[in-house]
Amino acid sequence: MTARTLYDKLWELHEVTRRDDGSSLIYIDRHILHEVTSPQAFEGLRLAGRKPWRIDANIATPDHNVPTTRAERQGGLESISDEVSRLQVQTLDENCDDFGILEFKMNDARQGIVHVVGPEQGATLPGMTVVCGDSHTSTHGAFGALAHGIGTSEVEHVLATQCLIAKKMKNMQVRVEGTLPFGVTAKDIVLAVIGKIGTAGGNGHALEFAGSAIRTLSMEGRMTICNMAIEAGARVGMVAVDEKTIAYVRGRPFAPKGAHWDAAVALWSTLVSDPDAHFDTVVELRAEDIKPQVSWGTSPEMVLAIDQHVPDPAIEQDPTKRDSIERALKYMGLKANQPITAIRLDRVFIGSCTNSRIEDLRAAAAVAKGRKVASTIKQALVVPGSGLVKAQAEAEGLDKVFLDAGFEWREPGCSMCLAMNPDKLGSGEHCASTSNRNFEGRQGAGGRTHLVSPAMAAAAAVSGHFVDVRELQGIESRE
């Protein structure tokens, strides 16, 4: 038998039929819905007189538009001040009620960001195809699943047929070998990858992360890396199944039980790339070479190590790249050759589908403990990715650590990752953010976003500017 990649295996498991034009009909195991991309899809079902093909394959939760202050959440739907946002959340509630779809509503203890809720509920399982009307659905690939975002029209197709038409992509492997240095995280790995291959590097590919450094990551770390595969240009990101994958899934609400569990584990254990499998593109990094990363510009590929300087367009030979650097410098209000550590900040955001899980909050709290948010920081937000993450953090006392340090402790939601709810940047404000995109206006009109890990964000909050978190944590923490 021909050696196959993980992507090849997942594709073959779900290919219903192959069409003459080279596309295939692919079966979808899990569909996750939120309030922004689903209203028109549900309306399409109504107009056509259809019902969802498999109601139990769908779960939903509002996340993009929900407010994150306790007072606003306690006020229910009427507390959502923006009319469009309120209507979208209300419409999701009504649609899920009408069609019988399980929804974790805004004040349900299980509510949260779709890409946090799916895995923690066990609704994301190894070997599945998972789709959602959100580009960061690649997150779920951390479980050895074939997961990607879809548009609103495709949301309707999945609801109606449980299938999608797709063309198979090329295979790409990113190998990270070696031991991660002290203070370097999954977020730093994926930012370094994007810095190396660019935001178009993975175009047309399904990207598998592999290597000894990837295998040592927790499931939370693997989700962070797969989450940002889309920023590397790849629609799909994935990590092969191993004992960590299976241990994470075991006992979760949607996970199989009894004999079904044993059968599932037997299948899941085969979801690895064969040793001689062919990859169209292979990218290699040494873990020892990666340092804490900070994005400086208006694209995730504009990223540098903490000890570097903002680039100088005058020495860039490529005119297109030179223009891009000049525009980014102007928008970000930075100067050529400025040290990354000299970038002063206005706000700090710890959250998003990239970095809002319990491991992320523990890492940030370890830095914040016993320190205070710098007086120059206008606001430092910590937004858990779900109600269950929030409850776990509070059980561990992390909320008290953050509050004592001067951070705000919020309710779950997408929050400041994107300007679709009250948590926004003002024009010209610099933010150290654990989110995934730093485009112009992403966090608010004129806002300036710098992508970092949770530990780096916490270090920036207590310093007022970017610092190497390893210096704050001290050499003794290495032991």
Curated annotation (Swiss-Prot):
Gene Ontology biological-process annotations: L-leucine biosynthetic process
Pathway listed: Amino-acid biosynthesis; L-leucine biosynthesis; L-leucine from 3-methyl-2-oxobutanoate: step 2/4
Cofactor: [4Fe-4S] cluster
GO MF assignments: 3-isopropylmalate dehydratase activity; 4 iron, 4 sulfur cluster binding; metal ion binding
Catalytic activity: (2R,3S)-3-isopropylmalate = (2S)-2-isopropylmalate
Subunit and interaction comment: Heterodimer of LeuC and LeuD.
PANTHER family assigned to the protein according to its UniProt record, in alphabetical order: 3-ISOPROPYLMALATE DEHYDRATASE (PTHR43822:SF9), HOMOACONITASE, MITOCHONDRIAL-RELATED (PTHR43822)
Name of the molecule in the record: 3-isopropylmalate dehydratase large subunit
Source organism (scientific name): Xanthomonas axonopodis pv. citri (strain 306)
Organism ancestry: Bacteria, Pseudomonadati, Pseudomonadota, Gammaproteobacteria, Lysobacterales
Gene responsible for this protein: leuC
